[in-house]
Amino acid sequence: LLPVFANLIPADPAMEALIRKMRAPFEDKLGEKLAVTEGLLYRRGNFNGSWDQLIVDALIAEKDAELAFSPGFRWGTSLLPGDTIRMEHLLDQTAITYPWTTVSMMTGEQIKTVLEDVCDNLFNPDPYYQQGGDMVRVGGLQYVCDPNARMGARITDMRLAGKPLDAGKTYKVAGWAPVSEEASKAGGEPVWENPAALARGKGGRLAVAVPGYGLPGRQPRWVAAPPA
C-alpha cells in the first residue's frame, strides 16, 4: 500500500489557522451525528454505490416519488460499517452550486429516453461522441443495460415495483442538480436535506441495500435494481 502523503507533510500553521477560522461558524452543523451506518458507504461504481442509493432512497421517500434520478458523481468520503454518518459526510457527497431538488411528471418513454441518452454519452463506439464516465443513478427502477447494443436499444426490461414500465403512463420522478436556471429557481430544497431527514428517522442505525450487477454470457450486461 502507498502511504497517504498528506499525513507525512507538516501542516502549514497559517493555512491550518485559516481553515479553523473558516469552519468555526459551521462546526455544529458539520458535526451533527445523523446515524451509524451498518454497511460500507461508498460512491465509486460506474452505475451506482451505497451513497447514491441513500440519496435516491431519500428522494423517493421525502418527495413521495415513484422513482428518482441522481447524477453520476463519484466523489466524497467512504465510510466503513459502524462509522458515524455526520452532516459533513453528507455534504461532501452533495455540496455543489446547484443542489436543488426537483419533482417532475415523466412518461415511461421519457424515462427510457433519459437513460438511453446518458448511455450513448458513455458507450458510443466513437470516442469523439463519448461525453461522460458514469451512468445516472436510478432509484426505484430495475433495468438491464447492454453497452454494446446500438443507440436507443441499450436499455431493456425496465420494471417499477416488479411490473414493466409503461411507455405511455406518467410517473412521479424526483431528482436534483438541475442545470437550467428555471429549474433551480423552482423552490426545491438542497438535496442533502432529504438523506439527512431519512437518516434522522432511522433511530440511530442506517442500512442501505445496494443493487447488484449481473454479467451473464460474453456480452457485458449490467442490472441496476431497487433494494429488496
Residue ranges and their predicted role:
Residues 1-12, 38-44, 96-103, 191-200:
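Charged, low-complexity surface segments at secondary-structure and domain boundaries
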Residues 2-85:
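Hard-cation-handling environments
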